[in-house]
Regions:
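Transmembrane alpha-helices and adjacent helix-loop boundaries
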Residues: 1-434
């Protein structure tokens, strides 16, 4: 019996349970946001990864779930009725499911890019109406509330919210995993691969796609409700296109072809955004570059790369991959350093603040501060640094791809099986060339 599918998730949950003991208050809040983003990505992957329905408007159900939770919390706060705080995500999921059925009924009448455009239009409709409907969405300022005590917990400290979020994340992840093994879950895969054949076999593909989409929206609503509980507020920006775009990018970066890949990608990119947004205004540019690089060199995503290595690399094969991957890391560090230096330098000299300094200096190019040092904008040395880093990184990249290709052949045993010494393209990392 293969225990890996049980042991690995159990170890992951155990780590998450013990994590708050080692985190600061700021990192604990970040961990809550990362788990919510991971659940959002898992819910989105049900529609996109399993059923092939690329939605550009999933933020609509994320926001609806959040506002459902907020209105219940407001009602509890006003003592209109009692509703246990740990069960509030059920309301978010219910609202997400209902609107997923209604909106999905219209959207799933079309496929491919037309489906994506319909979902985007419906989300933009809510995004436009939300600031106008003050009673429901609180206009531009949104609605603020407080978490109420339930079941002996106050849900005031962040660690209690962390464990509540963790419980819902684990439960929802298990439900999504189990759904993939139900007849409807198997039908979702068939719809993705060949919808015409499924229709020929007698299935009502429109109804099936609507149900699958609604279930995806259900768990998206749960994620939105958890966000509302953790933030104790919400505004119309929850429906914004940035939330819909983020979950798409995070899913592809994590790897839509694996189950936990999107969750991993969402957690990593949420943490990346939280850290870099405090350091630079160019963090969105870096996030976009990461997406482009992943699509170019790892189109299967981070989860796909891990899965590929777990399947293909033989026992002891990791030894021959250590050196190629170390060279690849050095190459990546050099390229990142060159790109960051260039971007931050350009961002600094093109700002209004720097332009004001030039005006004060009567048009002269004054030195600018970067990484604790002073640089002259017109000095050849200033621009030689990033160019040298990029050139050296580019040279090492060519060497790294060759080393990875050869190491991959040895690690997987393909060199012995193929007399030409070449591995099939689908059996090696995309960045490697034979």
């Amino acid at each position: 019996m293969n225990l890996r599918p049980i042991i690995l998730p159990a170890v992951g949950v155990a780590i998450l349970v013990m994590l708050p003991m080692f985190l600061s208050a700021n990192m604990l809040a970040a961990s809550i946001t990362m788990m919510i983003a991971a659940l959002f990505a898992l819910a989105f992957t049900l529609a996109m990864g399993q059923a092939g329905m690329l939605s550009f408007g999933h933020a609509a159900y994320y926001g609806l779930g959040a506002f459902a939770a907020i209105h219940i919390m407001v009602a509890v706060e006003k003592k209109l009725f009692f509703f246990p705080t740990p069960l509030i995500p059920i309301a978010g999921g219910a609202i997400g499911f209902v609107f997923g059925l209604v909106f999905g009924w219209f959207a799933t009448q079309r496929t491919s890019v037309y489906f994506s455009m319909v979902t985007l239009a419906l989300a933009e409709l809510l995004y436009t109406l939300a600031p106008v409907w003050n009673t429901v969405f609180g206009a531009e300022s949104g609605i603020q509330t407080e978490r109420g005590p339930s079941w002996g917990f106050t849900f005031g400290p962040d660690f209690e919210v962390y464990y509540l979020t963790l419980a819902w994340f684990v439960l929802s992840a298990w439900c999504l995993w189990a759904f993939g093994r139900t007849p409807l879950g198997r039908l979702a895969l068939a719809l993705r691969d060949n919808e015409h054949r499924v229709r020929f076999l007698g299935f009502n593909t429109h109804l099936a796609r609507t149900l699958i989409f609604a279930i995806s929206c259900l768990f998206t609503g749960v994620a939105g409700a958890l966000l509302a509980i953790s933030k104790e507020s919400g505004n119309y920006e929850l429906f914004g296109p940035s939330n819909s775009a983020n979950v798409v990018l995070q899913t592809f970066i994590g790897g839509a072809g694996t189950f936990f890949g999107p969750a991993f990608g969402a957690a990593v990119m949420t943490f990346f955004a939280r850290v870099t947004s405090d350091l630079t205004r160019s963090w969105l540019l870096y996030q976009g570059l990461i997406f482009v690089l992943v699509m170019l060199f790892m189109p299967e995503g981070l989860g796909g790369i891990v899965s590929l290595h777990a399947r293909r690399v033989k026992s002891g094969g990791w030894k021959v991959l250590v050196l190629p991957y170390l060279v690849c890391l050095v190459c990546g560090a050099l390229l990142i350093a060159g790109i960051v230096f260039t971007v931050e330098s350009l961002h600094t000299v093109l700002t209004d603040a720097y332009n004001a300094k030039r005006v004060a200096a009567k048009g002269a190019w004054v030195p600018y501060q970067l990484f604790g040092r002073s640089f002259e904008p017109l000095s050849p040395v200033t621009w030689t640094i990033p160019l040298a880093l990029l050139a050296l990184g580019g040279l090492l990249l060519r060497l790294a791809t060759r080393l990875i290709s050869r190491g991959w052949l040895l690690a997987t045993g393909a060199a012995a099986d193929d007399p030409n010494g070449r591995a099939a393209a689908h059996d090696r990392p995309q960045g490697a060339t034979a």
